[in-house]
Regions:
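Catalytic cores of carbohydrate-active enzymes
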Residues: 21-136, 177-219
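Catalytic-core region of carbohydrate-active enzymes that cleave or remodel glycosidic bonds
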Residues: 162-185
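A glycine-rich beta-turn/hairpin centered on an aromatic-Pro dipeptide
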Residues: 106, 229-230
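Solvent-exposed loop and edge beta-strand segments that line ligand/cofactor-binding
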Residues: 3-19, 74-98, 139-157, 162, ...
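Active-site-proximal binding-pocket segments
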Residues: 155-156, 171-173, 189, 198
């Protein structure tokens, strides 16, 4: 269905992030059902989890990482085929911790390190959006390097730290932890600027400052201290 700027969205859009959350949380639900003696329900739930894993690999695996979504036009979001926003952080960690595919896990961790990691933490997406996309809405309204447009969200950095540790990549996990943990960022307080003893919601991504034609000027600068689920 054709996307309409007015009159609402179609029901075509699908979130790969939510699909990965389903496969991640599902086994806990299966465990509860088994504990309650509801074996038939547990088997049905497990079948749906296995089905979702297969669908994710068939429809959302981009070759080196997991896509972010299909938009309201049914077009790929978070794919190497996209002009901007080719890779997003959100689905990666939960797809890894869901054991969807071992080979995919290795490739995803490598892509995260190559495409998302910076000395101040993992950016939410890369490349940043440089213009407004009506099908994406709010995320493409922020300047590059801020908030959901390639900012460094400490909250979802934690998901990748957990995923790397889960996959047995302890050194990679600790590297990411060290990039955002207050105990390890004291030396960059002059850049970070927020209280050095607390997490903030975001830090400026590598593109921060592009809105004043000084890309990188505010890279690593903290924002919204205390306000985070990290």
């Amino acid at each position: 269905p054709k996307f309409k700027a007015e009159g609402g969205y179609s029901k075509v859009a699908e979130s790969v992030f939510v699909a990965a959350l389903f496969t991640y949380a599902g086994p806990n639900f299966v465990g509860i059902l088994n504990h309650l003696g509801k074996k038939n329900d547990a088997a049905k739930a497990q079948a749906e989890i296995d089905k979702m894993k297969k669908v994710i690999m068939e429809s959302a695996w981009d070759g080196n990482w997991f896509m972010r979504a299909y938009d309201a036009n049914g077009q790929k979001m978070g794919s190497h085929e996209c002009e901007e926003g080719q890779i997003f952080i959100e689905p990666q960690g939960f797809a890894i911790m869901s054991d969807i595919d071992k080979d995919a896990t290795k490739k995803t961790l490598a892509a995260i390190d190559e495409r998302l990691n910076t000395k101040h933490g993992l950016v939410l997406n890369n490349p940043a959006f440089s213009k407004y996309y009506i099908q994406y809405g709010e995320i493409s309204t922020y300047p590059g390097g801020y908030k959901e447009n390639a900012g460094i969200f400490t909250h979802n950095n934690a998901w990748i730290i957990c995923a790397a540790a889960y996959a047995g990549e302890g050194n990679q996990a600790f590297k990411y932890y060290s990039e955002i943990a207050p105990a390890y960022t004291e030396e960059t307080s002059d850049i970070h600027k927020t209280e050095p003893y607390v997490y903030g919601q975001i830090s400026g991504g590598k593109d921060a400052g592009s809105y004043i034609c000084q890309t990188g000027k505010n890279f690593g600068q903290g924002k919204y201290s205390w306000l985070t689920g990290t």
